[in-house]
From Swiss-Prot:
Pathway stated in the Swiss-Prot or TrEMBL entry: Purine metabolism; AMP biosynthesis via de novo pathway; AMP from IMP: step 1/2
InterPro entries: Adenylosuccin_syn_GTP-bd, Adenylosuccin_syn_Lys_AS, Adenylosuccinate_synth_dom1, Adenylosuccinate_synth_dom2, Adenylosuccinate_synth_dom3, Adenylosuccinate_synthetase, P-loop_NTPase
Catalytic activity, EC: 6.3.4.4
Protein name: Adenylosuccinate synthetase
Organism the protein comes from: Haemophilus influenzae (strain PittGG)
Record flagged with keyword GTP-binding: yes
Main location group: cytoplasm
Binding site for GTP: 13-19, 41-43, 306, 332-334, 415-417
Family that this chain belongs to: Belongs to the adenylosuccinate synthetase family.
Gene3D superfamilies, per the entry: Adenylosuccinate Synthetase, subunit A, domain 1, Adenylosuccinate Synthetase, subunit A, domain 2, Adenylosuccinate Synthetase, subunit A, domain 3
């Protein structure tokens, strides 16, 4: 009997999803991306070799896996071809194993130009986007004016649609943002030069997934970003432009929600966030700096330093509600080695004195919120690369168990290093 498993970030992204997807891909036939775009950087380290995948599913490094990009993903043709080229130069036959929905919206140069222009205009109030055109591409999708991969099949119609939409964008870029317009002919020529390669990978993703399920195949859905960045349920407006929660699987791939068997929430042993927005447990002291240093907390795509803080069980409880999380995978446990004490935020004190155990929704509702911590003894022993749970320090085990208690969800997988072998699977999601 095949199982369908979702892997998603339960915090603000950068939790280490790529490694865990890669680890569990050994068990599956299909790996599916269902939301986001090339703003998601999944870093994999296999046999000491580092690979960063931004758009193509992490399963591409496994020769027997077919990778699918669902309709919920916005696709930059330029980024796709660049990533394909990087993988093909290593002997990976991407075109034989990558299939893409024709309903995927395209990210084109005018989306990137608009993204940069808006962030510059906002100044210090900027959202902190990756500047890759993700948001504007999703806007076009909702406004029903966007170009999609399926439009590449009719080159004449594509050229006409592109001309109309570029007039719309260039008017804003020139007259409102006072920046250079995007060149129509260059944009058209660049896309047409690679159109046949992209259309050659188009497939009916929904039917492929339905057939795989009926045939008893294991399927893995690979989420990008994190729950607290969800466009609807995250810390709005400091969010991404897609549904990063488990509901995005159904809408972003066409896979029926009743067919999902297990949702694995990836959590760091602490918390990080990139860009603006509320972050209740953020540390501004030497402890925060030490976590950032030990955890090498810099964005895989942007290179920006990540904000660091203690584990926030309040935000995680919201993630559990939103995703019906079956179990956690805790990553970067080894980063907390050596601290005299470790803390877990178990509640928030609101500005009016109310104590709450679930995170607010809108960013404005986080203003003035204070974390209420439980402090536990730390551990001096080294947990890096430990692969036997019985060899973990007792205080480390106590920390893990306390997180399970305050969240009500078991930690089924533990990660103690960047390589996929540096992992303890306590309960296999495909056997749960």
């Amino acid at each position: 009997m095949g199982k369908s498993v979702v892997i998603l970030g339960a915090q603000w992204g950068d939790e280490g999803k790529g490694k865990i997807v890669d680890l569990l891909t050994d068990r599956v036939k299909y790996v599916v991306r269902y939301q986001g775009g090339h703003n998601a950087g999944h870093t994999l380290i296999i046999n000491g070799e580092k690979t960063v995948l931004r758009l193509i599913p992490s399963g591409m490094l496994h020769p027997n896996v077919t990778c699918l990009i669902g309709n919920g993903v916005v696709v930059s043709p330029e980024a796709l071809m660049k990533e394909m080229g990087e993988l093909e130069s290593r002997g990976i036959k991407v075109r034989e194993r990558l299939l893409i929905s024709e309903a995927c919206p395209l990210i084109l140069p005018y989306h990137v130009a608009m993204d940069h222009a808006r962030e510059a205009a906002l100044g210090k109030k900027a959202i902190g986007t990756t500047g890759r055109g993700i948001g504007p591409a999703y806007e076009d999708k909702v406004a029903r004016r966007g170009l999609r991969i399926g439009d590449l099949f009719n080159k004449e119609a594509f050229a006409e649609k592109l001309k109309n939409i570029l007039e719309y964008y260039n008017f804003q870029l020139v007259n409102y943002y006072k920046v250079e317009p995007v060149d129509y002919q260059k944009t058209l020529d660049d896309v047409m030069a690679i159109a046949d390669v992209i259309t050659g990978m188009v497939a009916d993703i929904t039917t492929i997934l339905d057939t795989a399920r009926k045939n008893g195949e294991h399927i893995l859905f690979e989420g990008a970003q994190g729950t607290m960045l969800d466009i609807d349920h995250g810390t709005y407006p400091y969010v991404t432009s897609s549904n990063t929660t488990a509901g995005g699987v159904a809408t972003g791939s066409g896979f029926g929600p009743r067919n999902l068997d297990y949702v694995l929430g990836i959590i760091k042993a602490y918390c990080t966030r990139v860009g603006g927005g509320p972050f209740t447990t953020e540390l501004f002291d030497d402890v925060g700096a030490e976590i950032a240093r030990k955890g090498n907390e810099f964005g895989a795509v942007t290179g920006r330093p990540r904000r660091c803080g203690w584990f926030d069980a309040v935000a995680i409880r919201r993630a559990i509600q939103l995703n019906s999380i079956s179990g956690f995978c805790m990553t970067k446990l080894d980063v907390l080695d050596g601290f005299d004490e470790v803390k877990i935020c178990v509640a928030y004190k609101m500005p009016n004195g109310e104590i709450v155990e679930y995170a607010p929704l809108a960013a404005k509702d986080w203003d003035g919120v204070e974390p209420i911590y439980e402090t536990l003894p730390g551990w001096k022993e080294n947990t890096f690369r430990i692969t036997d749970v019985n060899k973990l320090p007792q205080n480390c085990i106590n920390y893990i168990k306390r997180i399970e208690e305050v969240t009500g969800v078991p930690i089924d997988i533990l990660s103690t290093g960047p390589d996929r072998v540096e992992t303890m699977i306590l309960r296999d999601p495909f056997a749960a």
